[in-house]
Amino acid sequence: MRTYGKLNILSYNTGKDVTDESIIPVENIRGPILLISTEADTVWPSTEQAAQIVSDLQEHDFPYEVKSLTYEKISHFAIPMRSNTWLLKLMFRSERQFPEECAAERTDLSEQAVDFIQNHW
């Protein structure tokens, strides 16, 4: 797992005790699910968690579509942004080191999310 930036609280957000109360029963969701994660996430282990969610849903024969998008360079703020990217560059090293890649991934994310929403809602 890569550690890129100044804002890195990943170690704080991993290795926690899992209790029944802390588990979200995703299999009870009644509709399609779009998961978005990034390997450069320095806030929480989003790629591992997305994979776990997909696995849990498969084990429960989840009847709705589940789409998981995983990006490589984009920061924890894997959201469509066309302005104020300077703030992301200030907070996350991956955004500074790979601005073109992050912009391309953000464009893909925007297109994929809009397509998913239009096809399901």
Report residues per predicted region.
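Mobile cap/lid helix-loop segments that gate and shape the active-site cleft of serine hydrolases
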Residues: 1-24
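Glycine-rich, phosphate-binding/catalytic loops in enzymes
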Residues: 51-54, 87
